[in-house]
From Swiss-Prot:
Keywords: Cytoplasm, Elongation factor, GTP-binding, Nucleotide-binding, Protein biosynthesis
Family (UniProt): Belongs to the GTP-binding elongation factor family. EF-Tu/EF-1A subfamily.
Entry keyword annotation includes Cytoplasm: yes
Record has Nucleotide-binding as a keyword: yes
Record-annotated membrane-spanning stretches: none
Organism: Microplitis croceipes (Braconid wasp)
Main location: cytoplasm
Source organism superkingdom: Eukaryota
Record-level GO cellular component terms: cytoplasm
GO molecular function, one term: translation elongation factor activity
Entry's localization field: Cytoplasm
Annotated protein name in UniProt: Elongation factor 1-alpha
Function, in words: This protein promotes the GTP-dependent binding of aminoacyl-tRNA to the A-site of ribosomes during protein biosynthesis.
């Protein structure tokens, strides 16, 4: 589930 958290941070940072 750590991967999802990392992706979430990347997505939020990309927005």
């Amino acid at each position: 589930a750590k991967e999802k958290i990392h992706i979430n941070i990347v997505v939020i940072g990309h927005v």
